[in-house]
Amino acid sequence: MSASDSSSAVVVLAAGAGTRMKSDLQKTLHSIGGRSLISHSLHAAAGLNPTHIVAVIGHGRDQVGPAVEDVATHLGREVRIAIQEEQNGTGHAVQCAMDQLEGFDGTIIVTNGDVPLLTSDTLGSLLAAHTATPTAVTVLTMNLDDPTGYGRIVRNADGEVTAIVEQKDASDEERSITEVNSGVFAFDATILRSALSQLKSDNAQGELYLTDVLGIARSEGHPVRAHIAADARELAGVNDRVQLAEAGAELNRRTVEAAMRGGATIVDPATTWIDVEVTIGRDVLINPGTQLRGTTSIGDRAEIGPDTTLTNMVIGTGASVIRTHGSDSEIGEDATVGPFTYIRPGTKLGAEGKLGGFVETKKATIGRGSKVPHLTYVGDATIGEYSNIGASSVFVNYDGVNKNHTTIGSHVRTGSDTMFIAPVTVGDGAYSGAGTVIKDDVPPGALAVSGGRQRNIEGWVQKKRPGTAAADAAAAAQNSVPNQEG
């Protein structure tokens, strides 16, 4: 439901302790698919474009409050926060939320911060069903093959909801009902306010139950109805780590399927993990063991993996990234990366460039067509176009106190095992010999070499390491050399 609905508000309940998670992190802050549980719920709420969104927080509010504010910033809209000082039941939580909805008289949807699979479409269908006919409360329900543990929905002959009966209180006939309560509701705001003021805590838990609103509404002659969700999986709550993993797997299945239907080939969906904010172009090939995290963007016709993890990366059209771990960086069009490449934040590889095996980069800008083929560290550096960095080279950027910058020009060729002692600049078209330690700037077109002439000390092994295998091998080799005299 994308159009603005000025007559709706959404309340997200996220005040519980979530003790079954056995975590120092508040339950709704655990993540699947690159978002926290409460972020998923707030995104679903925002998809309705309601007048107000209210998050009710309590336990761990020092953690949850800033997280809600971050999501609101990401959504570009206000999310009001209500504090439930004492966790005294779902009815009390909604009472706390109503302070943020003073004067609002439309439809209030109440959902939970631990149902990450619930979509805006399903909330929209609930809202549409609720407003189609005058209704006090509409319960979002689901049909389950095994309803054990859930509150059963009891309807009358007209299809109205007469009761929600909990498992422990249900008769055998009621236990056979497969339609159950999801814990998500749509309320008429005026009726909800009145009913909330009448809630009592005369129950085994001594709490105020939101479900008691239904009985109050019916006792006053207001209709209570149910709307069955099309996909019960959306309403699966997360209460422990097992359910967190199950929800994550289901969300990933959806995300991977959407990518394939959008034109990407995913060789093995079972070993491919894609966060919900990842974007993937057409004719992309994703090989097994690939993880695409955060806001990663994959251009058309790129190939990713196998065994690759990319977080907040931008991959250009036609690029190939194989057996690579990369984050917060950009790979240009038709560039090649891997295998066994480590791309740290701030790397920008130009179009048609190459980062090869066992190369590590950090805060490095590498120009179009330039290559770093193997066994090299490039940190705090700028490399121009069409340059080649020899194997086993190191950009020595740290002097023990500061990180320093190296600048390599275009069309530069450096020999293997070159050390660049930053800060240093190598001009366009320059070369370096193998094993060179570059401490001073190299002018354009110059050849940089360091070190003296090679010196061989004859017979050193036999004198210093007599009796060793090396000495014996040397002696045998020397004795086999033909005598050139006479």
Curated annotation (Swiss-Prot):
Q: Which UniProt keywords apply?
A: Acyltransferase, Cell shape, Cell wall biogenesis/degradation, Cytoplasm, Magnesium, Metal-binding, Multifunctional enzyme, Nucleotidyltransferase, Peptidoglycan synthesis, Repeat, Transferase
Q: Which GO terms describe its cellular component?
A: cytoplasm; membrane
Q: Where does Mg(2+) bind?
A: D114, N239
**Disulfide-bonded cysteines:** none
Residues that, per the record, bind acetyl-CoA: A391, N397, Y398, S416, A434
Q: Where found, per UniProt?
A: Cytoplasm
Reactions it catalyzes: alpha-D-glucosamine 1-phosphate + acetyl-CoA = N-acetyl-alpha-D-glucosamine 1-phosphate + CoA + H(+); N-acetyl-alpha-D-glucosamine 1-phosphate + UTP + H(+) = UDP-N-acetyl-alpha-D-glucosamine + diphosphate
Where are the residues of the annotated region N-acetyltransferase?
263-486
Q: Sorted alphabetically, which Gene3D superfamilies does this protein's record hold? A: Hexapeptide repeat proteins, Spore Coat Polysaccharide Biosynthesis Protein SpsA, Chain A
Give the multimer and partner information: Homotrimer.
The protein depicted here goes by the name Bifunctional protein GlmU
Tell me what organism the protein belongs to: Corynebacterium efficiens (strain DSM 44549 / YS-314 / AJ 12310 / JCM 11189 / NBRC 100395)
Which taxonomic lineage is given here?
Bacteria, Bacillati, Actinomycetota, Actinomycetes, Mycobacteriales
